[in-house]
C-alpha cells in the first residue's frame, strides 16, 4: 500500500498527518507536485516533481496508482480516475470518494464551473478548520486499518 498525495493544493496540516502515518506504519507516502515541496527526511516519504502543465501531476498519479493504494486529493476528476482504477481516494476534509458519490460530485463541479463561467460568483470552499483536520485523521486511520489487515 502507498499513499499518493496531490500535493500542490494539499494543506500542510494534512501533509503532517500523512507523514506521521507513513512513519508509524512504515508505508510509502509519495507527494506529487509541479514544483519543489519540502518533505522531512524519511525513507518512507518521497516527492515527485512533474513538469508544469494542465493535469500533469494528476496523470502521473493515475498512471502509477495501484488497486491497494490511497490517494489524497481535492481534485474530483482525479478522484474519479483513481476510483475507476479500483484504488481509494479521500479529500483533505476526510470525505471518502466512492463509485456511488463521485458522479454526483462531478456533476456539481461541472455545474459550479458553468455558473462561474457565466459570471455568477459562487464563492469558494469554507476555511479549513480543526474539525476538517480531525475528520481527515479519523477517515485516514479507518482506511489504513482496513487496508493493513
Swiss-Prot record:
It comes from the Bacteria. Pfam families: DUF188. Transmembrane segments: none annotated. Belongs to the UPF0178 family. This is UPF0178 protein Mmwyl1_2258. It comes from Marinomonas sp. (strain MWYL1).
Amino acid at each position: 500500500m502507498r499513499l499518493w498525495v496531490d500535493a500542490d493544493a494539499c494543506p500542510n496540516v494534512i501533509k503532517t498527518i500523512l507523514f506521521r502515518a507513513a512513519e508509524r506504519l512504515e508505508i510509502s507516502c509519495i507527494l506529487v507536485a509541479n514544483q519543489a515541496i519540502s518533505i522531512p527526511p524519511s525513507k518512507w516519504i518521497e516527492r515527485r516533481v512533474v513538469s508544469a502543465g494542465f493535469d500533469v501531476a494528476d496523470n502521473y498519479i493515475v498512471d502509477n496508482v495501484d488497486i491497494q493504494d490511497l490517494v489524497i486529493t481535492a481534485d474530483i476528476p482525479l478522484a474519479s480516475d483513481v476510483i475507476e482504477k479500483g484504488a481509494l481516494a479521500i479529500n483533505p476534509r476526510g470525505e471518502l470518494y466512492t463509485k456511488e458519490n463521485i458522479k454526483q460530485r462531478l456533476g456539481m463541479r461541472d455545474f459550479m464551473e458553468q455558473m462561474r463561467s457565466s459570471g455568477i460568483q459562487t464563492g469558494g470552499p469554507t476555511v479549513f478548520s480543526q474539525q476538517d483536520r480531525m475528520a481527515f485523521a479519523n477517515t485516514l486511520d479507518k482506511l489504513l486499518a482496513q487496508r493493513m489487515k
